[in-house]
A protein has these predicted regions:
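Intrinsic-disorder-associated, low-complexity terminal segments enriched in Asp/Asn/His/Tyr and depleted
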Residues: 2-4, 13
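Short, composition-biased linear "edge" segments at structural boundaries
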Residues: 17-19, 207
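Short hydrophobic/charged patches on amphipathic alpha-helices used for structural packing
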Residues: 61, 241-242
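Ser/Thr/Pro/Gly-rich low-complexity, intrinsically disordered segments
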Residues: 6, 19-22
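Ferredoxin-type iron-sulfur electron-transfer modules and their immediate structural context
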Residues: 22-164
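Short, positively charged and aromatic/hydrophobic N-terminal segments
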Residues: 10, 16-17, 34, 38
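Beta1-alpha1 glycine-rich phosphate/pyrophosphate-binding loop at the start
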Residues: 27-50, 79-91, 100-102, 129, ...
């Protein structure tokens, strides 16, 4: 019995000392980690998919067969004018390519990065079964990024004569409908509960997949159409439907 007690006491002392040392050590690690974070800049994750150069984009665009009945267009949920913008890109007409994309898409720099192209436009390309499908998403992304950098397209603000529209939420659906309505002459206000617009684009997709700066740049283009954003505004708590109507 005495021997067993001695063993138990030894084990108790061992684990007690271990726990104290572990807690002390962890406190030291956490303190060092906190100090390290204060002194070092935050890590920035690069995109996993690199963009084309101008020469690469034009070369890829020239592979398009410009089909008479483009199946790629049928595979696109918004029926983007894919062969048309690729044709303009193949000739180096970036402004024309961007104007064609804008006819259907309000968020091309985002769609060019996160859309499941293999299941949609690119997956319907006649060259896809042979493993040589046109990289439609990367081409769309290239044109959109080129436009952002070079400021090729700056649309005229249409006169807001068709009334007011409230959009609840500034996720991809809210941004898209706001852009479409603004182009048609409606005065659009987006009510967003978060401190920054974007919804799932801003808060739900990791930086290496969709950089926050890209989302912000696309939102700036929507805002440039005359769309107003009301942030930190929770509809249903801070405002109800009657309050919105009371604002006109």
């Amino acid at each position: 019995r005495n021997k067993n007690k001695l063993i138990l006491l030894s084990l108790w002392h061992f684990f007690t000392n271990f726990a104290v040392q572990y807690e002390t050590g962890m406190q030291g690690i956490l303190a060092c980690d906190k100090l390290d974070k204060m002194n070092k800049p935050k890590a920035v994750f690069r995109e996993i998919n690199e963009s084309y150069t101008l020469q690469e984009a034009i070369a890829e665009a020239k592979r398009c067969l410009n089909c008479k009945n483009p199946s790629c267009k049928k595979g696109c949920p918004i029926e983007n004018h894919i062969p048309e913008f690729i044709h303009e890109l193949s000739k180096g007409n970036m402004g024309n390519a961007m104007a064609i994309i804008n006819e259907k898409s309000n968020l091309p720099a985002i769609c060019g990065r996160v859309c499941p192209h293999e299941k949609q436009c690119q997956g319907h390309c006649v060259l896809y079964p042979k493993g040589k499908g046109i990289e439609i998403g990367k081409l769309e992304r290239f044109v959109a990024d080129f436009d952002t950098e070079m400021k090729l397209i700056r649309e005229k603000l249409p006169q807001k004569t068709r009334g007011k529209v409230a959009v609840i939420g500034s996720g991809p659906a809210g941004l898209t409908v706001a852009g479409d309505l603004a182009r048609q002459g409606f005065n659009v206000t987006i009510f967003e509960s978060q401190a920054e617009p974007g919804g799932v684009l801003m808060y739900g997709i990791p930086e290496y997949r969709l950089p926050k700066q890209v989302v912000r740049q696309e939102i700036e283009k929507i805002e440039a159409l005359g769309v107003t954003f009301l942030l930190n505004c929770v509809v249903g708590k801070q405002l109800n439907i009657d309050d919105i109507f009371a604002q006109g």
